[in-house]
Design a protein with these regions (language model features):
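Class I S-adenosyl-L-methionine-dependent methyltransferase catalytic core
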Residues: 1-164
Length: 164
């Protein structure tokens, strides 16, 4: 559906949900305010009610779908709750390479929490950095279109983005 088209218009999440568009690969960079709000919900189901990513999932359950959430490591628990609320199964955490040996505190470092659904894909690819362009490159290599980036403005062919 999105082949040979360039999507770079800013759309609010509520409008995107009403559009009935569906995505197989979603990258989310939540704001600190969103993280704080989700942390205080009494049920993880409330996350999807507040932020209805489940409404955007691809309809074909035979296609691999993934959701990548970039957060500080101290928010891994909330990210996994988000994946569960949105119907994704937690797969892995991708953390930056550490210059020190041994166990180090990553709580203030950005990590990528990855979840999936549908037919599984096993990959051993790494991500160059936590920059949006590198996240997009990784998602294109590991995921399926259509693609959605939530939380930042991106200007990438065949990607739609959503702010707010």
């Amino acid at each position: 559906m999105f082949d040979n088209q360039k999507f770079n218009s800013e759309i609010k999440l509520s409008i995107l949900v009403k559009s009935k568009l569906h995505f197989n690969t979603i990258i989310i960079i939540p704001s600190d305010n969103q993280i704080d709000k989700w942390k205080n919900f009494s049920s993880i189901k409330d996350i999807n009610f507040d932020y209805p990513i489940r409404s955007l999932e691809g309809l074909d359950k035979n296609i691999f779908q993934q959701c990548l959430i970039k957060v500080k490591a101290k928010h891994i628990d909330i990210s996994i709750n988000c994946l569960n609320s949105w119907g994704y199964k937690y797969n892995k955490i991708m953390a930056p390479r550490q210059p020190k040996s041994g166990l180090v505190d990553l709580s203030s470092k950005f990590v990528l929490v990855v979840g999936s659904k549908g037919l599984s894909k096993n990959n051993r690819l790494t991500i160059k950095s936590d920059q949006s362009t590198d996240l997009i490159y990784y998602a294109k290599k590991t995921g399926n279109s259509p693609f959605l980036f939530i939380g930042e403005v991106v200007n990438e062919k065949n990607w739609m983005y959503c702010i707010n």
